[in-house]
């Protein structure tokens, strides 16, 4: 039987292959499709007009990097079952499913005290019921309850696929070139030791560049004074509306 897949052309990574089956069903699901209408960097477009990319695009990019990372780790003798590979790919596709509009603004107003990670988990569990338990392993990995801890680190850690994608993607769309990182080289340097994600010694320079790029992106994009001011005004507006409605 021929390998069936959906091919998506991504401006950052080129062609992204999504296998037909569970992963493609996740991509088509209304809860993930909702992210096509949510900007990845919230109100940063008031400063960087090109920053119109969405959390859906980011989720696909992180999925692509996860696929590359799994292949690389397996090539170094780290045994990963097909079911585990599919589950960790599902987990990264769904990691931002709980995000609302305007980045983290809603966490400080409408859904105060509830993080987007908690909402993501709640929605994942709802989807798992719809899909007759097919996401159970992905949820275990997402919650860091699976024995192979390095799989969770690929989803949420200091050097996860989430960060590798958003730094390259946000750099690309904002035009802040200082944020561009060599994600391909970093992934090639990944390995596992004592059930933890590690980097080969010859990849240290790439990690230093990654840390520097992340810091520069926070200074120039995520914490830019103008977009932060816009967020503060929006928070004040939403809190006032909430007060009047109560």
Model-derived features: where do they sit?
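Sequence-structural signature of the catalytic-core scaffold of metal-dependent phosphohydrolases
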Residues: 1-39, 46-90, 98-246
């Amino acid at each position: 039987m021929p390998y069936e897949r959906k091919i998506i052309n991504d401006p950052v990574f080129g062609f992204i292959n999504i296998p037909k089956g569970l992963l493609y069903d996740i991509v088509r699901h209304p809860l993930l499709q909702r992210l096509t209408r949510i900007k990845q960097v919230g109100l940063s477009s008031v400063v960087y007009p090109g920053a119109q990319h969405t959390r859906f695009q980011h989720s696909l990019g992180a999925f692509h990097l996860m696929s590359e990372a799994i292949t690389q780790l397996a090539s170094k003798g780290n045994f990963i079952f097909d079911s585990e590979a599919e589950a960790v790919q599902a987990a990264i596709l769904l990691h931002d499913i709980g995000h609302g509009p305007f980045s983290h603004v809603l966490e400080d107003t409408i859904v105060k005290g509830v993080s987007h990670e908690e909402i993501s988990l709640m929605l994942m569990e709802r989807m798992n019921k719809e899909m007759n338990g097919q996401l159970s392993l992905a949820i275990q990995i997402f919650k860091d309850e699976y024995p192979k801890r390095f799989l969770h680190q690929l989803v949420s850690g200091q050097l996860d696929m989430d960060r590798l994608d958003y730094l390259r993607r946000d750099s690309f769309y904002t035009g802040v070139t200082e944020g561009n990182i060599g994600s391909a080289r970093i992934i090639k340097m990944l390995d596992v030791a004592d059930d933890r994600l590690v980097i080969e010694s010859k990849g240290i320079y790439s990690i230093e560049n990654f840390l520097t790029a992340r810091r520069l992106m926070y200074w120039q994009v995520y914490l830019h004074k103008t977009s932060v001011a816009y967020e503060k005004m929006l928070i004040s507006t939403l809190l006032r509306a909430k007060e009047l409605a109560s």
